[in-house]
């Protein structure tokens, strides 16, 4: 065989090998191997939590880490029965406000998930509960709760003593309606006060509404929730990207540099913090700091500090563990563990752009409606807006019941 022909064959072989290598390195491709071509544990793929586990352990299961099979079956049945009652309800008997509140029903919530084995995602403290708030955090929550209750005190919510008005009293419209909120309104500014989701009972501007209504509710850490949760992990040497598809199209993305470089300067604050990753054996450990003061997780904001551990347990399972710390919010750190199950790359798609803002006519319509209410009251054509609930000021604890009855048996 001539040298020329040998050279041609050699060139073809080299090109073929390069193409195969590039295909193997293509980000996001799944592999049967649990290791990347460059020798790191492979976390890539589309993942979800396919069972329902409460964040905190319900009091009646204190000191028990696992449900029995019988308890799991009974809890599944109770949830299914509650959803069935909601589906059978006649919408004609509702007012407009309750009908809007009921829009978040079984079609939105992931009620099809079966109960998991564990009684809580929290594994430390051993009681499975979020540690107590610090005095500083308790005061902040109390101040915001007091303000929230003042703005709903003239509504039927308090008149009828429905869920959401706990701690409040029915009375005339409060002069505090004209006040600036004591703190930035977030997901939990209401201190757990009803379905306002952190919104206050006013619509002077978008900032009066909760982060969810403003398509800004996505937060870290993200344990999923009732409205669905998927994530996609893509790896490359020195970098890992995570695409979250969660809630009502409120997806988001984060990039984790795998580096020894220090965090950003302390004055640089980001909505999902600043991540720095390193490999510890088979686990990717990610340190996250520098959160924005407008972000929110269970009462914590700019002082939130996370240490995450991502571990591939087998071909179909990732364990996600995160230790959560903020000494201005909780009396001690606490740790959550959650398992994600691998999904088909062919049958699922993660949307890289959040869809919540696209076609979101709800916010401008709500603000326009509030202005019309004010005009009608000024012209003596309608009631005082302070006596109305703006987009539901509470009373729909889980999105299923007009009476505020919670269809989640774990919260009873």
State the predicted function of each range.
Residues 2-412:
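PEST-like low-complexity, intrinsically disordered acidic/proline/serine-rich tracts
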């Amino acid at each position: 065989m001539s040298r020329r022909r040998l050279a041609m064959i050699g060139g073809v072989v080299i090109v073929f090998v390069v193409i195969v290598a590039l295909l193997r390195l293509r980000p996001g491709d799944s592999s049967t191997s649990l290791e990347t071509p460059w020798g790191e544990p492979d976390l890539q793929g589309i993942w979800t939590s396919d069972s329902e586990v409460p964040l905190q352990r319900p009091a009646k299961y204190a000191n028990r880490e696992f449900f029995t099979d019988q308890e799991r079956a009974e809890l599944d049945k109770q949830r299914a029965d509650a959803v069935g009652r909601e589906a059978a309800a006649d919408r004609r008997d509702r007012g407009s406000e309750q009908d809007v509140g009921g829009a978040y029903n079984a079609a939105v919530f992931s009620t099809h998930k079966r109960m998991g084995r564990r009684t809580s995602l929290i594994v430390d403290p051993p009681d499975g509960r979020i540690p107590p708030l610090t005095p500083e955090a308790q005061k902040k929550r109390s101040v915001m709760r007091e303000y929230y209750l003042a703005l709903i005190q003239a509504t039927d919510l308090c008149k009828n003593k429905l869920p959401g008005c706990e701690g409040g009293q029915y009375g005339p419209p409060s002069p505090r309606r004209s006040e600036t909120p004591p703190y930035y309104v977030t997901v939990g500014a209401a201190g757990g006060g009803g379905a306002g989701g952190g919104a206050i009972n006013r619509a002077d501007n978008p900032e009066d509404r909760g982060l969810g209504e403003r398509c800004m509710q996505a937060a870290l850490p993200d344990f999923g929730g009732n409205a669905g949760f998927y994530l996609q992990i893509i790896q490359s040497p020195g970098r890992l990207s995570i695409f979250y598809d969660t809630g009502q199209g409120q997806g988001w993305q984060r990039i984790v540099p795998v580096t020894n470089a220090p965090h950003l300067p302390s004055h640089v604050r980001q909505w999902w913090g600043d991540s720095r990753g390193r490999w510890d054996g088979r686990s990717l450990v990610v340190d996250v700091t520098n959160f924005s003061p407008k972000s929110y997780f269970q009462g914590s904001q700019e002082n939130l500090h996370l240490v995450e551990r991502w571990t591939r347990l087998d071909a179909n399972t990732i364990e996600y563990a995160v230790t959560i710390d903020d000494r201005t919010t909780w009396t001690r750190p606490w740790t959550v563990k959650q398992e994600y199950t691998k999904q088909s790359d062919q049958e699922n798609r993660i949307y890289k752009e959040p869809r919540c803002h696209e076609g979101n006519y709800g916010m401008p319509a709500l603000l326009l409606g509030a202005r019309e209410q004010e005009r009608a009251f000024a012209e003596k054509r309608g009631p005082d807006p302070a006596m109305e609930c703006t987009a539901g000021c509470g009373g729909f604890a889980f999105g299923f019941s007009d009476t505020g009855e919670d269809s989640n048996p774990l919260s009873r």
